[in-house]
Curated annotation (Swiss-Prot):
One of its GO terms (biological process) is menaquinone biosynthetic process. It comes from Escherichia coli O7:K1 (strain IAI39 / ExPEC). InterPro entries: AB_hydrolase_1, AB_hydrolase_fold, SHCHC_synthase_MenH. Belongs to the AB hydrolase superfamily. MenH family. Keywords: Lyase, Menaquinone biosynthesis. Its EC number is 4.2.99.20. HAMAP family: MenH. Pfam families: Abhydrolase_6 (PF12697). This is 2-succinyl-6-hydroxy-2,4-cyclohexadiene-1-carboxylate synthase. SUPFAM superfamilies: alpha/beta-Hydrolases (SSF53474). The keyword Transcription does not apply. PANTHER family: 2-SUCCINYL-5-ENOLPYRUVYL-6-HYDROXY-3-CYCLOHEXENE-1-CARBOXYLATE SYNTHASE, PROTEIN PHYLLO, CHLOROPLASTIC. Monomer.
Length: 252
């Protein structure tokens, strides 16, 4: 079994760019940014429970990493960068820290490196279980209307929230809930030490208005690019800013 993905081929000899979306996104999420880098071959992945991979369920990050590795092999991708947003960034960091043959580097936008104590994990598990129950049982428009009121999305205006609620409500609530629980921050290890000891290139992007993740970025041994006029979802709020940062990273 492999993950559903869209592949776009570029020039031979360059590494692939493998894009991983955030929670409730899909393979289209990164394409406005990724298609600027047409010299590189691009793979836009649907994570389990999402898009064309909605029917795929996992028990945790190890399963996600295994599926990602099989997917890369199936597309004959010898060397690559992982570019991930939020959940996709956490998947990228987890997979990279476990060791991936052919990995050139990781670019994470607004991805959490992991909680650092049992109290935080217990609280996060309680919160994610409540959200998962809502995703399973309530209309998605109602759930996402509340989801985008969370503090991390404080920089969004009303119009941006309405657009995101409409876009995300096309998902399957049950499969979103399953993925939310399987990849909760409550079950993700703290990756700070692994990332400090890494052997791969590691860059971090965060929105200028995303105070929570700017603070987290300062804790990581990574070169950080702050995206102007953007909050947590920087590549949606300021794609040109993310494109400029990615171009610098890739020396495009």
């Amino acid at each position: 079994m492999i993950l559903h993905a869209q592949a776009k081929h570029g020039k031979p000899g360059l590494p692939w760019l493998v894009f991983l979306h955030g929670f409730s996104g899909d393979c289209h999420e990164w394409q406005e940014v990724g298609e600027v880098f047409a010299d590189y071959s691009r793979l836009y992945v649907d994570l389990p429970g999402h898009g064309g991979s909605a029917a795929i369920s996992v028990d945790g990050f190890d399963d996600v990493t295994g599926l990602l590795c099989k997917t890369l092999v199936s597309y004959n991708i010898p060397d690559f960068w992982l570019v991930g947003y939020s959940l996709g960034g956490r998947v990228a960091m987890m997979a990279a820290c476990q060791g991936l043959a052919g990995l050139c580097g990781v670019v994470v936008e607004g991805g959490h490196p992991g909680l650092q104590n049992a109290e935080q994990r217990t609280e996060r598990q309680r919160s994610d279980r409540q959200w998962a129950q809502r995703f399973r049982t309530e209309p998605l428009t109602a759930v996402f209307a509340d989801w985008y009121q969370q503090p991390v999305f404080a920089s969004l205006n009303d119009e941006q929230r309405r657009e995101l609620v409409a876009l995300r409500s096309n998902n399957n609530g049950a499969t979103l809930a399953a993925m939310l629980e399987a990849t909760s921050l409550a079950v993700q290890p703290d990756l700070r030490a692994n990332l400090s000891a890494r052997t791969f290139a590691f860059y971090y992007l965060c929105g200028e208005r995303d105070s929570k993740f700017r603070a987290l970025a300062a804790e990581l041994a990574a070169e950080c690019y702050v995206i102007p006029r953007a909050g947590h979802n920087a590549h949606r709020e300021n794609p040109a800013g993310v494109i400029a940062s990615l171009a610098q990273i890739l020396r495009f």
